[in-house]
From Swiss-Prot:
Single annotated GO MF: glycine hydroxymethyltransferase activity
The protein's Enzyme Commission number: 2.1.2.1
Gene source species: Thermosynechococcus vestitus (strain NIES-2133 / IAM M-273 / BP-1)
This protein's pathway: One-carbon metabolism; tetrahydrofolate interconversion; Amino-acid biosynthesis; glycine biosynthesis; glycine from L-serine: step 1/1
NCBIfam families for the chain: PRK00011.1
Name of this protein: Serine hydroxymethyltransferase
Residue ranges of coiled coil: none
Amino acid sequence: MTHIDWLVQTDPLVAEMVQREVQRQQQHLELIASENFTSPAVMAAQGTVLTNKYAEGLPGKRYYGGCEFVDEVEQLAIDRAKELFGAAHANVQPHSGAQANFAVFLALLNPGDTIMGMDLSHGGHLTHGSPVNVSGKWFNVVHYGVHPETERLDMDQVRDLARQHRPKLIICGYSAYPRVIPFAEFRQIADEVGAYLMADIAHIAGLVASGYHPNPVPLCDVVTTTTHKTLRGPRGGLILTRDEDLGKKLDKAVFPGTQGGPLEHVIAAKAVAFGEALKPEFKAYCGQVIRNAQALAAGLQARQLRLVSGGTDNHLMLIDLRSVNLTGKEADRLMGEIHITTNKNTIPFDPASPFVTSGLRLGTPALTTRGFTEVEFAEVAEIISDRLHAPEDEAIKNRCRERVAALCAQFPLYPHLQFPQPVLA
């Protein structure tokens, strides 16, 4: 019996829910920039007996017996992560990117210390000091942003704020910034004011690993990332550093500082994903992600849709929907009606609330995994533009949905995931 057979036999209700999600992923175009499709091997690793094993501590230094084989798995993940990013030390245990960031804060900061991070509305992340997040409640937060004219990082502002506030930690790396991050310039500023420098590369980790974005590991004191998104692994976190002594502090901040037992089945999946990312095929994939983003951006701009900062250097872009008199909330709904999955997003200096927004964030990693090239993304740009420019036209909506269905059929996803029909009798 396969794992699907076991699920159907034991809990057909859950199986039916999973089946519907499989069908949604297969029949929709995934353009959420933070999402991707893992390989069957990554998914298989997460479904192994490693889920049964407690393994508090680190390889060779556990608090439980019977860890000799999970030690091998975790050490392999560590070694591959170090090789992939050129790091001296890696911790593969964080359950998420947020957990990785919290561990760094515990290792380097005390409550009340000053940190600097990008404003969430300009493309930052909740864990970089947003007032609704614990990082914004425990620390004195100074936010920087983008220049109002270029919509690119305002490094003069970053330097001035750092000199004025003397932060203990400066965070660079973002969730909705479509341009290359100048890590070297951040390093100069951090050195000038005596601050630690942390890069959160959750969105661009795959591009960094494959050489399509500058690597922050040689320049930053610590680097955090998720292991999904452009890295195309399981949902999880990772901490990297070039400093072995700092690495020991970071290890203690993960366990026992912020977590208990690691998820060894997920760590096994991380090891598989890192192994995949070390292969030439992954570099080719990331190059296609970039080319597809350029094609999508060009197609949208050719149809009078304004992009924040005028385009993209990486895998994502932001449409300023004020050019078509729509909100992000409205555009997200319009896309959903034609089976394109996106997310509303604030844009710099957004006049709308975070629950409404004036932007729509798009990314190319997931559809690139399905096999899309510049040709298909040119068509995707047409479909998006047609829908946004004529939101009330039912004929256009139906035609867009038909084109989406044809693209999905042309590039099937997970054809091996076969469920009995129907799951629920």
